[in-house]
Amino acid sequence: MKNNHPKKIFWLASYPKSGNTWIRAILSSIFFTPDGIFNFKLLKNITAFDSGINYEFLKTININDFKNLNKINIISQYWIEAQNRIKIDGDFVIYKTHSMNANIYHNDLQKNFQYTDKNITLAYIYIVRDPRDVVISYSNLKSGVVE
């Protein structure tokens, strides 16, 4: 499928509990307000790419694959196509992801599948947080104790 909006995706990538929401708040204030004042409703402008909504087209192509998007060997076959099908209102869209930009090789298909490529990606921010802080943040989320 031809990409009508080359270089249209701005990626916000991170390991879970690394400050993704905080960066989304900053980006939302910059890109989605006229005055830079943050409002929590703005966070809806930056959603997770790997949510099912970006793969709705699969319902008419292959319903079994749509039902199994939680499997890496299924979803990886459709990453690029899903990105090419994205409809945007402005110049770009921002998506958050916890996925890595890597090739996934399928033995059964004898083929590599890439998460994204330079023809689709406008920019990216990769958030890196001290792993010790990630563990504490995750423990707080789960109301547990880190020893």
Enumerate the language-model features and the residues they cover:
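PAPS-dependent sulfotransferase catalytic domain
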Residues: 1-147
